[in-house]
């Protein structure tokens, strides 16, 4: 059995969540990655990439007679990919921040923009982490004197009940050739 370290980031893709049509497999993931509509992030600014899962929150209920805990509720923490795109075009800015992007300009949308993407990360040790449906919040951020696009992509529960909120695959399971 292969050991997983899941260190760093080698590749990062984003796609329409509707492309995940059922329980995600390595074969379906390969098809999504090869789809011309799937885009690759070409630049992630140094030391900004991470995947974090918040600690679950728990509520304990005590028996008033004994003061012992007799029941506990748990709420799982959010899972989030975070990164800053250091170099980008205006179409990429629009894909993550909303608004309208062209080859030579970007215009911010009025009001709140809700953006959802299928996020696909490949680590340096060739492990794929996939959020089939993620809520994307992005903003302008200053990194080392340049304005990047700071992105937080939080895994959501997909609409299709056959699809999980997070998947991991060894690259040997994913055909991208």
What role is predicted for each listed range?
Residues 75-78, 106-111, 144-147, 154-158:
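Glycine-rich loops and low-complexity Gly/Arg-rich segments
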Residues 85-108:
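Charged, amphipathic alpha-helical segments
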Residues 2-88, 132-146:
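Solvent-exposed edge beta-strands and adjacent loop segments
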Residues 80-84, 118-120, 150-154:
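Beta-strand secondary-structure signal
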Residues 103-141:
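Acidic, glycine-rich flexible loop segments
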Residues 125-177:
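Mixed-charge, glycine-accented linear interaction segment located at domain edges/termini
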Residues 21-41, 99-107, 161-169:
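Short secondary-structure boundary segments
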Residues 54-56, 86-90, 124-126, 156-159:
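Generic structural motif
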